[in-house]
Amino acid sequence: MLETLYQSLVSAGADSSGCAHLGVTPDGHSWAEAAVLPAGVYDRTAILEGIVYPLTGDRTGARVVNGFIWRYLFSADILQRENVTFEGAYLEDELFLMEYFCHAQRLAVTEQPLYRYLINPNSATHKYMRDFVQTFQRFMERKSALAERFSLEAACPQWRENSHWAGLLIAIGNEYAPGNDKPLRARQQAIEDLCRRPEIAEAISGLVPEGLSANKQLVARLVRGGHFFILTQLYRLKNRM
């Protein structure tokens, strides 16, 4: 993998390269996941339009750009010169890619699936996260700083609303996850309280998320309509609580 990415980078005169990957389940089933962009060589403008802007403002669409950092070969010079680092253990990959690709000048992409990614049902992202809301708040603080630093708001005017919707949908699924030992009524109240927060309420009233799956569309409609009891009952049935 690294040799192919490196050769792709060198032959294109690029500072970064990326590839597709294979998703793999524990039972051996696998499928190809497309690269972030079609095979080719991209300049800074195309990198911003194809990676940075979607990471900034399009977080609920049908083809969200994910923070798959293991699909790229990065420039050590950029990382060290610009001090691009990680913070925290959740959603940090999105911020890392946002910041890094604001500095990258040339990206070579191959559609070869060079990495095998195990879909682990026991990973942290598949379990109840007790501190998710606090983690997401910190994520938004850092994302806001990046958006301001790199003047991203002009290209992504509703990035806050879009990002808050994405976080809200994750928070709802997390609140009703089997690992949460709170009573159902307390979980429902937690979601209602979250939706009343000014930044979340603004996103709910100011943006109708597009490109959601059928299930998430239903969740979004129930939230926008204030039907939290129905939402809770649907999750109770779904998760057999």
Regions found by a protein language model. Give the residues of each.
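Membrane-interface aromatic/basic loop that binds lipid-linked glycans or pyrophosphate carriers
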Residues: G13-A14, A177-M241
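Donor-binding/catalytic cores of nucleotide-activated saccharide
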Residues: M1-L91, L95-V109, L118-Y128
